[in-house]
């Protein structure tokens, strides 16, 4: 298993992003909150071949938002302008004191890794870490998002330096193709992840990256946390691009786009590059409050994890009970949630490993279907769980253990790449021991 720790946190407000993602945690005491043996879980020592690493995302650390021919991405527009996309047209304008992000923060400079990449790699080496997961900026490589419109040589040069620099320092690169920063032109021209056109666009972009970097990169991730960037950016509208009500359509297209990129690698590059490629999914662990709540907790897991994991790892189809609940709720585009036989065959087994991001655990109970309980479950957090640095994050190590067992049992996955840690709230770096 591989664990990634963030090297540099979000340049844009982490508090704002995670308040939108998690919501202010609902704290409620319950008998299940108190289990001393469980809560003081100690997993023992890590195996000798365990790989320690750090992870970043291009928009969160690079800066250089207009440097050397880079195109705008949806986060550039979301942070620089106040407004949202309607019918694929961005109605944003100069913020005039109103912003989509707390404090009108942007990632124009961020951690300045576009300039300071050597310093960052030296830090990773000095920490004794063995791997570095970073993402490529689609708009830095393809300013309009389209291969047909030409590529940006400066962007290719930057990532060549980063990859070669990592390898020269004995650091194994894990490269993510998409970490939420869609080229703005693809959003404005056809609606980004709400359109089937994104499938071919993403596959062509992936092909470009495999061709230019795959001679040295042997570990690829297609999409990072699709449930987060879709649910927050295309349903609630609180993240880029600020679209509302398009959740299930956009979710559907992420699976098809991922599978298309995987098949490009499988058919054109695997034999000569000998790498591996997969998708990274994000989920909380959902613990039932009582035995009567187990079905509700399972529904949460199937909606947040199984929505992608079952088609990819089990049978090429969505969980039927999840689709039924979505239709019962009357959600828009629920009718789109099915695959043709050809699509199903493309999706099934389209990941060489189970990529997992996990930060949080919750207690789940059932509730009657209503406007405030659309899917039959609700969740809360225990006030006695240890508080981490961010206000929304609590330390629940046994939740990760339960989650890993769930993945092993339900998806028969032996190979898990995992991202997640708990910070104590300090920016200091402490020496070992």
Give short role names for the model-derived ranges.
Residues 3, 106, 113, 148, ...:
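Generic anion/oxyanion-binding catalytic loop in active/binding sites
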Residues 109-122, 143-146, 151, 155:
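Internal amphipathic alpha-helical repeat/solenoid segments
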Residues 102-116, 194-196:
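Active-site mouth loops of central-metabolism enzymes
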Residues 12-101, 125, 144-146, 153-433:
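Active-site region of glycoside hydrolase catalytic domains
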């Amino acid at each position: 298993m591989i664990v990634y720790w963030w090297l540099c946190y979000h340049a844009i407000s982490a508090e704002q992003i995670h308040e939108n993602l998690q919501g202010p945690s609902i704290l409620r005491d319950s008998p299940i909150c108190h289990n001393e043996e469980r809560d003081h879980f100690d997993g023992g020592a890590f195996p000798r071949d365990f790989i320690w690493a750090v992870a970043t995302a291009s928009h969160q650390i690079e800066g250089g938002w207009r440097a050397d021919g880079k195109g705008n991405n949806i986060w550039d527009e979301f942070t620089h302008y106040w407004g949202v996309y309607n019918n694929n047209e961005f109605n944003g304008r100069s913020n005039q004191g109103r912003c989509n992000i707390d404090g009108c923060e942007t990632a124009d400079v961020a951690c300045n890794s576009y300039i300071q990449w050597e310093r960052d790699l030296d830090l990773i080496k000095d920490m004794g870490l063995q791997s570095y997961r970073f993402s490529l900026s689609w708009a830095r490589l393809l300013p309009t998002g389209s291969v047909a419109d030409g590529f940006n040589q400066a962007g290719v040069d930057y990532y060549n330096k980063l990859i070669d620099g990592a390898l020269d320092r004995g650091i194994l690169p894990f490269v993510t193709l998409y970490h939420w920063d869609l080229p703005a032109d693809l959003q404005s021209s056809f609606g980004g992840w709400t359109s089937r056109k994104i499938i071919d666009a993403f596959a062509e972009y992936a092909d470009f990256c495999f061709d230019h970097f795959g001679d040295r990169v042997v570990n690829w991730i297609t999409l990072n946390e699709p449930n987060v960037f879709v649910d927050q950016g295309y349903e609630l509208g609180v993240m880029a691009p600020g679209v509302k009500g398009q959740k299930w359509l956009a979710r559907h297209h992420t699976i098809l786009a991922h599978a298309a990129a995987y098949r490009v690698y499988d058919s054109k590059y695997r034999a000569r590059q000998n790498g591996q490629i997969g998708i990274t999914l994000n989920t909380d662990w959902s613990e039932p409050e009582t035995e009567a709540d187990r079905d509700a907790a399972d529904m949460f897991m199937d909606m947040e994890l199984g929505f992608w994991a079952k088609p990819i790892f089990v049978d090429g189809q969505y969980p039927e009970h999840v689709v039924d609940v979505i239709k019962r709720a009357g959600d828009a585009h629920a009718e789109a949630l099915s695959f043709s036989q050809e699509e199903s065959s493309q999706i099934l087994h389209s990941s060489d490993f189970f990529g997992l991001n996990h930060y949080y655990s919750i207690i789940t109970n059932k509730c009657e279907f209503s406007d405030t309980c659309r899917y039959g479950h609700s969740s809360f957090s225990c006030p006695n769980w240890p508080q981490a640095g961010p206000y929304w994050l609590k330390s629940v190590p046994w939740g990760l253990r339960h989650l890993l067992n769930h993945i092993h049992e339900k998806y028969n996955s032996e190979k898990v790449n995992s991202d997640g840690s708990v910070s104590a709230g300090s920016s200091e770096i402490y020496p070992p021991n």
